[in-house]
Amino acid sequence: GNCIELNNDCDGSKDDCQCCRDNAYCSCYNFFGIKSGCKCSVGNSGTGYSVCLKKLECPNRRAWTSWKKECTKPCIGKRC
């Protein structure tokens, strides 16, 4: 049930559940179809929201959250 902290190396062949935080995903350079330099990263609020929605079902969610199942919607047109 562990997870990888931000900016640490992750496995590009595994899903984003390996990265801690609801909005963190395994970001890789794609070099001729080969993933390399993969690190747990966060994008902007829009990216974070879609990543979070996918990560709601991670079996190891307890590693970074107390099982809360909510994602913060991105601010659209400055209305938050």
Curated annotation (Swiss-Prot):
Q: What GO molecular functions are on record for this protein?
A: calcium channel regulator activity; toxin activity
- The cysteines covalently paired via disulfide bonds are 3-20, 10-26, 17-52, 19-40, 28-38, 58-71, 75-80
Q: Which domain of life is it from?
A: Eukaryota
Describe, from its UniProt entry, the tissues in which this protein is expressed: Expressed by the venom gland.
Sorted alphabetically, the Gene Ontology cellular component annotations on this record are: extracellular region
Q: Name one Pfam family in it.
A: Toxin_34
Its primary localisation, in coarse terms, equals secreted
Subcellular localization, as worded in the UniProt entry: Secreted
Q: Which UniProt keywords apply?
A: Calcium channel impairing toxin, Disulfide bond, Ion channel impairing toxin, Knottin, Neurotoxin, Secreted, Toxin, Voltage-gated calcium channel impairing toxin
What's this protein's family per the entry?
A: Belongs to the neurotoxin 04 (omega-agtx) family. 03 (type II/III omega-agtx) subfamily.
Q: What is known of its domains?
A: The presence of a 'disulfide through disulfide knot' structurally defines this protein as a knottin.
What the protein does comes down to:
Omega-agatoxin are antagonists of voltage-gated calcium channels (Cav). Induces rapid general flaccid paralysis followed by death when injected into the cerebral ventricle of mice at dose levels of 3 ug per mouse.
Q: What is this protein called?
A: U20-ctenitoxin-Pn1a
